[in-house]
Amino acid sequence: MRHLIAAFLVAPLALAGAALAADGEYTLVIKDHKFHPATIEVPAGQKLVLIVDNQDPTAEEFESRDFKAEKIIGGGRSARVNVAPLKPGEYKFFGEFHMETAQGTLVAK
């Protein structure tokens, strides 16, 4: 019973940090032409790296006009996207090849 209670207490903490890979690195997964997680909270004023892991069999073009990023990522491949320090606010990104479903937001705080 103690293990079950501990699992319920720890699970939300583990999920909250799921996108954070290492200091300043955040992982985004493309699956079924959607970003997971769709929203990532990042610290304002710091450089960061997005590790975009495309788990779909087809390519996707990761793009943001808000923080000026663009990279084609082949199916089953990963790529690093460097992002300059951001001011506090919301910054949209999308998959240009599947714009109707591949949408996401960086929230800099």
Residue ranges of predicted features:
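Sec/Tat signal peptide C-region and signal peptidase I cleavage site
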Residues: 15-21
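Asparagine-centered strand-capping/turn motif at beta-strand->loop junctions
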Residues: 52-54
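Positively charged n-region of N-terminal signal peptides that target proteins for export
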Residues: 1-9
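Short beta-strand/loop motifs in extracellular/secreted proteins, especially
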Residues: 48, 58-60, 102-104
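N-terminal edge beta-strand
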Residues: 22-45
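Extracellular/periplasmic metallocenter environments
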Residues: 27, 74-109
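Beta-strand-rich interaction surfaces with strong enrichment in secreted/lumenal proteins
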Residues: 38-40, 68-72
